[in-house]
Amino acid sequence: MNKLRQSFRRKKDVYVPEASRPHQWQTDEEGVRTGKCSFPVKYLGHVEVDESRGMHICEDAVKRLKAERKFFKGFFGKTGKKAVKAVLWVSADGLRVVDEKTKDLIVDQTIEKVSFCAPDRNFDRAFSYICRDGTTRRWICHCFMAVKDTGERLSHAVGCAFAACLERKQKREKECGVTATFDASRTTFTREGSFRVTTATEQAEREEIMKQLQDAKKAETDKTVVGPSVAPGNTAPSPSSPTSPTPDGTASSEMNNPHAIPRRHAPIEQLARQGSFRGFPALSQKMSPFKRQLSLRINELPSTMQRKTDFPIKNTVPEVEGEAESISSLCSQITSAFSTPSEDPFSSAPMTKPVTLVAPQSPVLQANGTDSASHVLTAKPANTALAHVAMPVRETNPWAHVPDAANKEIAAIHPGTEWGQSSGAASPGLFQAGHRRTPSEADRWLEEVSKSVRAQQPQVSAAPLQPVLQPPPPAAIAPPAPPFQGHAFLTSQPVPVGVVPPLQPAFVPTQSYPVANGMPYPASNVPVVGITPSQMVANVFGTAGHPQTTHPHQSPSLAKQQTFPQYETSSATTSPFFKPPAQHLNGSAAFNGVDNGGLASGNRHAEVPPGTCPVDPFEAQWAALESKSKQRTNPSPTNPFSSDLQKTFEIEL
C-alpha cells in the first residue's frame, strides 16, 4: 500500500548543489552583461536594518517578513498579506523588480548603492540584499523568494552585476585618465586628468606616447647603470605628437608612477591670452570704461580717442612750437594771471603789488622833430629814485637772480640819457617770456612799414643801460601813479619826493628791438602815438620836415576828473575806492609816474636837447591826452569791456 500510495505522490527533483551547475552560472553571467538576465520571484518586502553587511542581518530580515505574513494570514484568514509575484531583472546598471501582472516597477536599485547580498541558510529559495536608501540615508534590506531557482543562483547573478559594474567603472577611469591621490593627514585629495571621453584617434596617440615614455625610461635606466645618473629632463628627446607635447615634468612623474596617464597639453599658440575685440587698442589701456569709478564723458571714450589719434585734424595755421615750459614759467604765468593790472577799471582799490621797472612794449618815437607826449612833459630833474610802474610780473622765472645792489637806484639821470632805450631793450624779453606766436596781420603790416622807414630814415643807435628789475627801497615804493592829478594846467601843492615818481628825460632816441615774430624793428622818427595806420603811412611817405600836430580824443575820465588812485597826502582828489582806468599794455607810450604836481612844482617847459625846436606846452598836453585816450580805447587783456569807452573833446583856455 505504501508503494501504491507513493506512486501517486509527486516525485521530488533530485537536488543538485549550485556548485555542480556551473553551466547555468555562465549563462547568468552573459545575461547580466547583456541585460537579459531575469528570475521569477516572490517579493516579500523590505525592512530597515542596523548594519550594512552580514548574512545574519539578511536572515533576520527574512524571518521578520515571513512572520508578519503568517500573522496577517492567520488573523484575517485568506485576506492576509501575500507576497507579490514579480520578475527580478539583474544587469550591470542595477536591480529592477517588476510586477508580474500589472508590469509596474516596484523596485529600481542601482548597483552602486548595494552594499551586500547573500542567500539564506535557512531557506534555500530565499535571497536578500542590503542597500542605502537615497532619500532617508538608511540601510534597507529587500527580501525575495525564488520560484524556480535557488537563492544561491540569484546571489551569484547579483555578484556578476557587481563585477560588470566595477569593470565598466575602471574602463571609464582608464579612458578619461583621472587619478586621485588622497592625503589622510590633511583630508584632501588631488585629482589628475579629465573625465572627457577620448576618441579612437586620441587613444592611439596616448598609447604611442606611453610607448615613447617607456622607451625613454628604459634608456634612462640603461644610462644610470652604465654611467653616472643624469637628470630625467636631459634624456634623449622623444618625438611627440604636435597636439600632445610631453614636458619634462610629465616624464619625471612617469618615473614615479608608471601607471599614471599623462595629461594632454594644448600648444603654446592656444595658451596665449587673446582679447575679444582688438579694434581699439585704447581699451586695454588705462582709459578702459570698465576700469573707471566716475562717469565717462563722450570725449573720453576709447573709441573717440582712437579716432582722434588715427585721424588728427590738420591745422591750417602753422604754429612754431615753443620749448617745454618749466615749473618756474608755469608759476610766473599763474602769478601774472592772478595779479590784476592797475589799468583795469573793473579791478578793486589799488594795492601794493610786486612791480617791475618796465617800459612800454613799443618804443617811444620822435615825431618829425617833436618829442612824444611822455618826453615833452618832463619837468623834474631826475635825481630821485625811480618809482616802479605796477604791471603784471612777466619774467620767465620769478625766482631768478636780480641785479646787484648797485642798480637799486638810478641817480642823476641827465636829460640826454637814453632811459627809454634801456627800457625798450628790456621789453622784448618780457614780451617773449611765454612763447613764440604766429605773426598777425598787424605784425606783417608793421614789418612792411618798418622796411619802408628803414629805407628812408637813418637808424639811430645808442648803448642801452642796464634795466632795473629789482624793487626800490621801501621809502621809494609808490602805488600805481596816474599821468595827471586834478585838472589840467592847474597848480597843485608840491608832493614829497618819495611819493611823486620822477619823470622821464626830455628826448630819448630809441634803438631797434625785435618784434614778437623775431623781426627787428628799427627806431624811426615817425609819430605812432594816437594816429591811425593810414596816417602813419602818410607820414612815412610824406614830407618829413613839417612838424605834425595830432588831434586826439580825450577820455571823459581824463577830462572831467583826472584823478587816479595814489596814496599821497597832498592830493585832495585822491579816492582809494576809485577804480583805476584801463591802460593798454602794448601801447606806444606810457607816463611812468608823470603827474600834474610835477608840472606845477617843476619846470613848466620841457628840456629840449639841442637840434630840436621848443614845443608848446598845450600841444604837449594835447598829445599826452591823445596818447592816454589811445591807450584807453584799445581793449585790455584783462577787461573785455574796456573798448566801450566814449571819446570827447575838451579844450581849456
Swiss-Prot record:
| Biased segments, Basic and acidic residues type | 213-223
Task: Establish whether keyword Cell membrane is in the entry.
Answer: yes
Q: Where in the sequence does UniProt note compositional bias of the Polar residues kind? A: 546-576, 632-646
Gene3D superfamilies from the UniProt entry = Pleckstrin-homology domain (PH domain)/Phosphotyrosine-binding domain (PTB)
Null allele outcome, as annotated, is: Mutant animals exhibit severe defects in cranial neuronal tube closure and die around 11.5 dpc, but neurogenesis abnormalities are limited. Mice lacking both Numb and Numbl genes die around 9.5 dpc, with severe defects in somite and vasculature formation, neuronal tube closure and axial turning. Conditional mutants, with expression abrogated in neural progenitor cells from 8.5 dpc are viable, fertile and exhibit no obvious phenotypes.
Topology relative to the membrane, per the entry?
Answer: Peripheral membrane protein
**Chain ranges of the PID domain:** 33-193
Concerning PTM, the database record says:
Phosphorylated on Ser-276 and Ser-295 by CaMK1. Ubiquitinated; mediated by SIAH1 and leading to its subsequent proteasomal degradation Isoform 1 and isoform 2 are ubiquitinated by LNX leading to their subsequent proteasomal degradation.
Coiled-coil region(s):
none
Function as written in the Swiss-Prot or TrEMBL entry: Regulates clathrin-mediated receptor endocytosis. Plays a role in the process of neurogenesis. Required throughout embryonic neurogenesis to maintain neural progenitor cells, also called radial glial cells (RGCs), by allowing their daughter cells to choose progenitor over neuronal cell fate. Not required for the proliferation of neural progenitor cells before the onset of neurogenesis. Also involved postnatally in the subventricular zone (SVZ) neurogenesis by regulating SVZ neuroblasts survival and ependymal wall integrity. May also mediate local repair of brain ventricular wall damage.
Q: Name one Pfam family in it.
A: PID
Segment Disordered: which positions? 213-260, 542-590, 625-653
What species does this protein belong to? Mus musculus
PTM-bearing positions, type Phosphothreonine? T102, T243, T438
Q: Which CDD domains match?
A: PTB_Numb (cd01268)
Alphabetized, the UniProt keywords read:
Cell membrane, Developmental protein, Endosome, Membrane, Neurogenesis, Phosphoprotein, Ubl conjugation
Annotated GO CC locations:
apical part of cell; basolateral plasma membrane; clathrin-coated pit; clathrin-coated vesicle; cytoplasm; cytoplasmic vesicle; early endosome; endosome membrane
Determine if Translocase is one of this entry's keywords: no
Q: What binding partners and quaternary form does the record give?
A: Interacts with SIAH1. Interacts with LNX. Interacts with CDH1. Interacts with TFAP2A and TFAP2B. Interacts with RALBP1 in a complex also containing EPN1 and TFAP2A during interphase and mitosis. Interacts with AAK1. May interact with DUOXA1.
Which PROSITE patterns does the record match to this protein?
Answer: PID (PS01179)
| Disulfide bridge partners, by residue number | none
Q: In which tissues is it expressed?
A: Expressed in subventricular zone (SVZ) neuroprogenitors and ependymal cells.
Q: Name one GO biological process term.
A: regulation of postsynaptic neurotransmitter receptor internalization
The compartments listed are: Cell membrane; Endosome membrane
User: What GO molecular function terms would the record report?
Assistant: alpha-catenin binding; beta-catenin binding; cadherin binding; phospholipid binding
The identity of this protein, by name, is Protein numb homolog
